[in-house]
Amino acid sequence: GDALAAPESHENKSVPVDTVPAYNETEPTSAPFDVSFEVGMDFNDGKPIVRVKTNLPEGTVFMINFISPINWGGTGRGGDDTAEVSPAGVAEFRPLTDQGEALPPAPYQVTINTIGLQPENVRSVMGEKGKNLTGNKVSEFNFGLGLEKWISQKFILEVHQDGSIAVK
């Protein structure tokens, strides 16, 4: 193969071939990533199923946490779950329940966050401590070790006496 010969400018034998993939792997860490993040819900007979539609990579792990605060007239109970983003760009959580039963009438504070420990393919997009993340769902805080950024969405889920559910 003469057709496969490298151009003369690249014939420096001191550059190992395996530096090319390493460069390509680290390249995305400097690119800002504008996050799209949309929450949807099926009411599911008082056991709401919450899902997130996002452009974050497959395998991104989200955590959902919900509580019915006593000072809002609630039970003080709640729960949490994690879900991974599917190839279709959706993370779906298990139904939100009160110890397996339909949620009793009360307001519930619901928070959805990305968790700190993410797969390698996700970390390469988010960047170290989430530094690449941009968009209106990005929260940031300096914990004393530098700025950290993550995705966060909070909302109030109101379960009414008639079993209907409203989102505030």
Predicted feature locations:
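Ser/Thr-rich low-complexity repeats and stalk/linker segments
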Residues: 30-37, 44, 55-156, 160-168
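Short edge beta-strand/loop segments characteristic of extracellular beta-sandwich folds
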Residues: 49-55
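Short coil/turn motif common to extracellular beta-sandwich-like domains
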Residues: 43-49
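Generic structural signal for short, flexible, solvent-exposed coil/loop and linker residues
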Residues: 24-28, 51, 74
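N-terminal low-complexity, Pro/Thr/Ser-rich intrinsically disordered segments
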Residues: 3-42, 168
